[in-house]
């Protein structure tokens, strides 16, 4: 395992497994294996500076959508910028996705840290990426706050697993419940039982039901849904590779790259449905409040194996 620092951080092992990290958003810029690019990665890295680009970035302090961008904690209110009509998505202007982190290399780890002040609340973030020879990436999140604040982090990597579209990607999620969102604003609404088009309890091609009327009668026109997990694993497979994601988050949000995006990426000339974002999260209906003197700790492990 070796870590090389240039303008970004290149990590590679003896198996041909490579990862590129960036201080911007403490992000995963690219994962490759056997020279196949396994993530949705812009050809021009400068595109990652766009505020509406979340590829591989850390999302927080609050992931997903908040009505009117308003956070209420006890008798205090915190206003986030609404970057969608009537909604703050991924924390708006306060989002970690466009914050520059401080990076430190330590053995087989890259540790990103950032201090943020929101009104009277001081928040410290530690995001640690650990690598090994088994083609695993472990992400540990550690957050502290000087006053109670809503914290719900995730990583927004889009996975392609060497494919140019989601057509040959299959997904397995063990879940009997999901969080239904408003079909117009996409705000989380209520817990409901899994329906057929959202049932991935047995491995299924993502595109099998993507044109189902339930999904198409929805602002996203595809998958943009949170599943309540029965266990701690999600599996994504292509013709060449298998990705296993383990975490201690209770939910996972699946987004199938539904909107046309003119950012040119390495793996596809398509404008949408080029990859799948798998975002482990806490409960989106009852987001956790981090109290003073408490520590927010979560982890995600990505393991990639070749099917050749």
Model-derived segments and their meaning:
Residues 1-308:
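An exposed, glycine/acidic-rich loop-and-rim segment of catalytic or binding clefts
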